[in-house]
From Swiss-Prot:
InterPro entries from the UniProt entry: Dynamin, Dynamin_GTPase, Dynamin_N, G_DYNAMIN_dom, OPA1_C, P-loop_NTPase
SMART domains with a match to the protein in the record: DYNc
Ranges annotated as biased composition (Basic and acidic residues): 213-224
Entry protein name: Dynamin-like GTPase OPA1, mitochondrial
Span list, region Disordered: 204-224
Region (G2 motif) residue spans: 333-336
Source organism of the structure: Oncorhynchus masou (Cherry salmon)
Length: 971
C-alpha cells in the first residue's frame, strides 16, 4: 500500500511541476516530518554527493517501521527543476497527512451526529401534544414528593456494594459463559455455511418479520405463558395440599388404630408412684363411671360444696385451690354440672383434666383463661338438648405449693325460680343432684351461706336436710365484709357462727371474705384484703368471732383434716363392701357361664372384629369357575326376558335373513349402549353381597356365639351401603360387550352345538311358561276334572271355546302373522256367537297372543333341530332358504357375550372389589370401635353386663386396697 501511495504522490508532483507553479523555497529543517527529513538528507545531491545509492532490498524492516519511498525519476528539466518538484510534493504530502488524521474524522462525526440528534429530538418534541392542561389530574402531593423524600438519607440506609457481595453466593462467570455461547454459535454457523440451513433460517426468520407483528406475537405468547404458569402453580399447590391432607388422614387413622389397640394389658407402661390423694381421686373417677345396682359408689368420702346461686361457692373453692379456675358471670348460672376438683400439694401450680394430658400453668393468665374456657365448654357439652344442667361429673386435678389435700365437688347453685332460657325442671334437677351427693353417709357437706342477706330470707339450706345433728356439715358464711356494713346488729353474725340462729349443729362454723366482687381480682389481692379486713374487723376485735373461725386458709385446713379423718374411718369398710360385691358377681358368673371367659364389651368387640375379617378373607378363596358360573346364570336370568321379547321375537317375524340381521344388530347396539352394562354391574354387586352373606352364615354355624349376630349384621349392612363399584368399570365393560356382540363368526362345530343347546333350553323354558299360562286361562282339562274334581269357571269356558276356534285358524294358516286382522277377529266372534258363546274382541286378541306365542316357539324348536346339521352350510356360506340358521348365530352371540361378561366381572371382583369391600369392612369396624353408644347397642345381654360389672368392681377393689396400703404406710 505504501508503494501505491508513493506512486500517487509522484503523479501529483509531476502534475504540479509540469504547470510550473509555485516559488522555490525551503522550510526549516527542524520542522520537517521525520520521514521527510530522512528522504531529504538521503537524496540531496549537493549535501552528500559521494554517498552511494540506497538499496532498499538490503534493509531490514519490522512491523513498526515504514517502507522507504522510491526515488522519483529525474525530470528532463535539469537538476534544479527536480529539486523544486521534490520539495513541493513533500509539502502537499505533509498537509494531507495532517488533515486526514483519525481524530479529526471522529470529532467531526461526533459533532455532526450530535447536531442531527438534537434536531430529531426537537422535531419529536414538537410532535407531542401539550399536556399542561391536564396537570390538575395529578394530585398535589406528587409534586411535593421530591421535597419530602430525603434521597441522601435513603442512600445512607442502603447497604454498601461490598456488604451485598458478601451476602450473595458466588456468581458464575458470565463473561466465560458469553464466550462459550459465541464460540458455539460460530461453530454452528460454520457447520451450516454451505447453504440455507435450518439454523440460519431460524436465526434470520425474526428479522424478516415486522416489528408490530413481532410485538403482538410476543405479547400474546407472554400472556399465554403467564396463564399457563399460573395454572401450573395452582395445580402444584392443589396437589401439594392434597398430599398433605392424605398424609394427615393416614396419620390420623394410624393414631386411631393405636388408641383402639391400646389397653392396660397390651401396653406395659412404666409405673409412676402416685400420691395418696391421686390414688383416692382415681378410685372416685372410676366410681363416677360405674353404674351398678349396688349403689356403692356414693359411700366414699368427698367434700360436697352446696349453697344458693351466687352465694360464693365457686369463690370459696377458688380460694382453697388458690387460682381463679372457674368461669364467672354476673348473676348468670355458670356451674351447669358437678365439678370434682382433686387438690394436692406439688412443686408447680398446675391443673389437668382426667382425660387429657395437657397441663395448665395457673401462674399464667393465658393458661387460666384457656382452663376456664375449657371448663365452660365441657359443661355445655355435658348438658343434653332441652336441659339446663347435667348430672355428669367433670374431673379436674389442681396441684400447687401449700394446697391442702382433699377432693371437693362443686355442685350447681340452688335456685328459687326458673328464669327465661332455663328448662322447666331445672330447679328439681339441681335439687336432685344435690340430694344424690348429700345422701352419701360419708360425704362432708360444705354449706355456703351469703352473709350479706338476711338469714331468714335464705331460699334453701341444704345442710339442714342431713338432720339437726349436722355431724357432716361445715357451715361457711361468705361476704362478711358486706354483712358488717349492712347489718345494724353484729350480734346476728355471732349467732350464725355459733350455731344458735339455725336449728342444727355443724362440725364447724367459718366466716370468710372472698374479695370485693370484682372478677379481675387476683387470689393474692383477695388474701391480703381478707387478712386486712379481719385484722381490723370489729367482729374479731370484740370477740364475736374467734381467730380459728376466719379466713379461707383456716377453712381449708379444717376441711382437709375432717376429710382425711372421714377417709380413714370409712375406706376399709367400703373396701369390704366391694369385696362382697365382687364375690356375688363371680358366683353369678360361675353358675350361669361356667365354660366362658369373662370378656367385657371391648374384648368381645375385638373378638367379633377378628371373626368378621376372617369371613371377609374367605371371599378371596372362591374359585374363578364358581364366580363365572353364578355370574353367568344370574346375568342370563336378568336379561333373558329382554332378549327373547324385545330382540328375538320381533326380529323373527321378518321374512328374510337380511332384515333379521339388521333388526338384531340395531336392537343389540341400543341394548348395549343403554341397559346391558348397568344390568351386568347390578348382577355382580348382588352376587358379591350374596356370597358375603353366605360365608357369614356358614361361619355362623361353626359353634358361633350368637352374641355377635347384631354386630355382624350391622357391619355387613353398613359395609354394603358404603361400597361403590368402580366407576371406570362400566365404560370398559360396555366396550367389551359391544365387541363380543359384533362378532358373528362361529369357528368350530362344538361352539355351534353349544349355541343350539343354549337356544333349545331357552325356547323350551319359554314354551313351558307359555303352556302354563294357557292352562290357567282355559282351566283344567277333562282328565283333571274327573281325577281331581275340578271345574272350569265361566271365563275359562269362554277362553276354552275361543282357543279351539283360534287353533283351527292356525291350522289353516300356519304362516300367519303375529297379529289378527280386524276381519279375522270379527269372523272368530261370529263363529263363537253361532255356538252361543258371547266373547269380547279384547279377550280374543289376548288368547291369540298366547296361542301364537306357543305356535311360534314350537316352530322355532323344530327349526333349531334342523340346524344341528347346518354348520357345514354356515361355514361354506351356502345360500339355502330352507336352512337359514340366523337365530342360532344370534344365540351364539348372546352366549359368548355372557361368557365374556362373566369373565370380566369375575376379574373385577377378585382383583378389585373384594379388596375394596374388605377395606370398607375394616373402616366400619374402626368407626364402630370408636362409638361406645353403638357398641352398647350392638353387644348386649346379661352376660356382657355381668362381665363389665366384674371388671369394674375388681378394678375398684384393687385400687382401694393399694390406697389403703399406702394410707397405712403414711400413718
Amino acid at each position: 500500500m505504501l508503494r501505491v501511495g508513493r506512486a500517487v504522490a509522484c503523479v501529483a508532483c509531476n502534475n504540479l511541476a509540469s504547470k510550473n507553479m509555485g516559488v522555490r523555497f525551503r522550510m526549516p529543517l527542524q520542522k520537517l516530518h521525520p520521514l521527510s527529513r530522512a528522504i531529504h538528507h538521503r537524496y540531496n545531491a549537493s549535501a552528500n554527493a559521494q554517498r552511494p545509492p540506497h538499496c532498499s532490498a538490503a534493509r531490514h524492516f519490522t512491523s513498526m517501521s515504514r517502507l522507504p519511498m522510491r526515488p522519483p525519476k529525474p525530470s528532463p528539466g535539469g537538476h534544479g527543476g527536480w529539486r523544486y518538484q521534490q520539495h513541493r510534493s513533500f509539502w502537499m504530502l505533509r498537509l494531507a497527512s495532517r488533515l486526514l488524521k483519525l481524530r479529526y474524522i471522529v470529532l467531526g462525526s461526533a459533532v455532526g451526529g450530535g447536531y442531527t440528534a438534537k434536531k430529531t429530538y426537537e422535531e419529536w418534541k414538537d410532535m407531542l401534544p401539550d399536556m399542561s392542561a391536564y396537570n390538575w389530574v395529578i394530585p398535589d402531593f406528587v409534586w411535593e414528593l421530591s421535597d419530602q423524600i430525603d434521597l441522601d438519607k435513603l442512600t445512607k440506609i442502603l447497604p454498601e456494594l461490598e456488604e451485598i457481595a458478601k451476602l450473595l453466593p458466588e456468581l458464575p462467570d458470565f463473561d466465560k459463559i458469553g464466550e462459550n455461547f459465541t464460540f458455539l454459535k460460530s461453530i454452528l454457523f460454520t457447520a451450516e455455511a454451505p447453504g440455507d440451513t435450518p439454523v440460519k433460517a431460524a436465526t434470520e426468520a425474526p428479522v424478516t418479520a415486522t416489528p408490530e407483528a413481532s410485538d403482538k406475537q410476543f405479547k400474546k405468547s407472554s400472556d399465554k405463558e403467564k396463564v399457563d404458569q399460573l395454572q401450573e402453580e395452582l395445580l402444584r399447590t392443589q396437589m401439594k395440599y392434597q398430599r398433605m391432607l392424605e398424609r394427615l388422614e393416614k396419620e390420623n387413622k394410624d393414631l386411631r388404630k393405636v388408641v383402639l389397640q391400646k389397653d392396660e394389658k397390651g401396653i406395659h407402661q412404666r409405673k409412676i408412684k402416685k400420691s395418696l390423694i391421686d390414688m383416692y381421686s382415681e378410685v372416685l373417677d372410676i366410681l363416677s363411671d360405674f353404674d351398678s345396682n349396688y349403689n356403692t359408689q356414693d359411700h366414699l368420702p368427698r367434700v360436697v360444696v352446696v349453697g344458693d346461686q351466687s352465694a360464693g361457692k365457686t369463690s370459696v373453692l377458688e380460694m382453697i385451690a388458690q387460682a381463679r379456675i372457674f368461669p364467672r358471670g354476673s348473676g348468670e348460672m355458670m356451674t351447669r354440672s358437678p365439678v370434682k376438683v382433686t387438690l394436692s400439694e406439688g412443686p408447680h401450680h398446675v391443673a389437668m383434666f382426667k382425660d387429657s394430658s395437657r397441663e395448665f400453668d395457673l401462674g399464667k393468665e393465658e393458661d387460666l383463661a384457656a382452663l376456664r374456657h375449657e371448663i365452660e365448654l365441657r359443661m355445655r357439652k355435658s348438658v343434653k338438648e332441652g336441659q339446663t344442667v347435667s348430672p355428669e361429673t367433670i374431673s379436674l386435678s389442681v396441684k400447687g405449693p401449700g394446697i391442702q389435700r382433699m377432693v371437693l365437688v362443686d355442685l350447681p347453685g340452688v335456685i328459687s325460680t326458673v328464669t327465661a332460657g332455663m328448662a322447666a325442671d331445672t330447679k328439681e334437677t339441681i335439687f336432685s343432684i344435690s340430694k344424690n351427693y348429700m345422701q352419701n353417709p360419708n360425704a362432708i357437706i360444705l354449706c355456703i351461706q351469703d352473709g350479706s342477706v338476711d338469714a331468714e330470707a335464705d331460699r334453701h339450706r341444704p345442710g339442714q336436710s342431713n338432720g339437726p345433728a349436722g355431724e357432716r356439715t361445715i357451715f361457711v358464711l361468705t361476704k362478711v365484709d358486706l354483712a358488717e356494713k349492712n347489718l345494724a346488729s353484729p350480734n346476728r353474725i355471732q349467732q350464725i357462727v355459733e350455731g344458735k340462729l339455725f336449728p342444727m349443729k355443724a362440725l364447724g362454723y367459718f366466716a370468710v371474705v372472698t374479695g370485693k366482687g370484682s372478677a379481675g381480682e387476683s387470689i393474692d389481692s383477695i388474701k391480703d384484703y381478707e387478712e386486712d379486713f379481719f385484722q381490723n374487723s370489729r367482729l374479731l376485735r370484740d370477740g364475736m368471732l374467734k381467730a380459728h373461725q376466719v379466713t379461707t386458709k383456716n377453712l381449708s385446713l379444717a376441711v382437709s383434716d375432717c376429710f382425711w379423718k372421714m377417709v380413714r374411718e370409712s375406706v376399709e369398710q367400703q373396701a369390704d363392701a366391694f369385696k362382697a360385691s365382687r364375690f356375688n358377681l363371680e358366683t353369678e358368673w360361675k353358675n350361669n357361664y361356667p365354660r366362658l371367659r369373662e370378656l367385657d364389651r371391648n374384648e368381645l368387640f375385638e373378638k367379633a372384629k377378628n371373626e368378621i375379617l376372617d369371613e371377609v378373607i374367605s371371599l378371596s378363596q372362591v374359585t374363578p369357575k364358581h364366580w363365572e358360573a353364578i355370574l353367568q346364570k344370574k346375568l342370563w336370568e336378568r336379561v333373558s326376558t329382554h332378549v327373547i321379547e324385545n330382540i328375538y321375537l320381533p326380529a323373527a317375524q321378518t321374512m328374510n335373513s337380511g332384515t333379521f340381521n339388521t333388526t338384531v344388530d340395531i336392537k343389540l347396539k341400543q341394548w348395549t349402549d343403554k341397559q346391558l352394562p348397568h344390568k351386568a354391574l347390578e348382577v355382580a354387586w348382588e352376587t358379591l353381597q350374596e356370597e358375603f352373606a353366605r360365608f357369614m352364615a356358614e361361619y355362623k354355624g361353626k359353634d358361633q356365639d350368637d352374641i355377635f349376630d347384631k354386630l355382624k349384621e350391622a357391619v355387613k349392612d353398613e359395609s354394603i351401603k358404603r361400597h361403590k363399584w368402580n366407576e371406570r368399570a362400566m365404560d370398559s365393560l360396555r366396550v367389551i360387550q359391544h365387541n363380543a356382540l359384533e362378532d358373528r363368526s362361529i369357528t368350530d362345530k362344538p361352539q355351534w352345538d353349544a349355541a343350539i343347546q343354549f337356544m333349545e333350553e331357552t325356547l323350551q323354558a319359554r314354551l313351558k311358561d307359555t303352556d302354563s299360562v294357557i292352562n290357567d286361562m282355559v282351566g283344567p282339562d277333562w282328565k283333571q276334572r274327573w281325577m281331581s274334581w275340578k271345574n272350569r269357571s265361566p271365563e275359562q269356558h269362554t277362553r276354552n271355546e275361543t282357543r279351539n276356534e283360534l287353533e283351527r285358524l292356525l291350522k289353516l294358516h300356519e304362516d300367519h302373522t303375529a297379529y289378527l286382522a280386524n276381519d279375522e277377529v270379527t269372523t272368530v266372534r261370529k263363529n263363537l256367537e253361532g255356538r252361543g258363546v258371547e266373547v269380547d274382541p279384547a279377550l280374543i286378541k289376548d288368547t291369540w297372543h298366547q296361542l301364537y306365542r306357543r305356535h311360534f316357539l314350537q316352530k322355532a324348536l323344530q327349526h333349531c333341530n334342523l340346524c344341528r346339521r347346518g354348520f357345514y352350510y354356515y361355514q361354506r356360506h351356502f345360500v339355502d332358504s330352507e336352512l337359514e340358521c340366523n337365530d342360532v348365530v344370534l344365540f351364539w352371540r348372546i352366549q359368548r357375550m355372557l361368557l365374556i361378561t362373566a369373565n370380566t366381572l369375575r376379574q373385577q371382583l377378585t382383583n378389585t372389589e373384594v379388596r375394596r369391600l374388605e377395606k370398607n369392612v375394616k373402616e366400619v369396624l374402626e368407626d364402630f370401635g370408636e362409638d361406645n353408644e353403638r357398641k352398647v347397642h350392638l353387644i348386649t345381654g346379661r352376660r356382657v353386663q355381668l362381665a363389665e360389672d366384674l371388671k369394674k368392681v375388681r378394678e375398684i377393689q384393687e385400687k382401694l386396697e393399694a390406697f389403703i396400703e399406702a394410707l397405712h404406710k403414711e400413718k
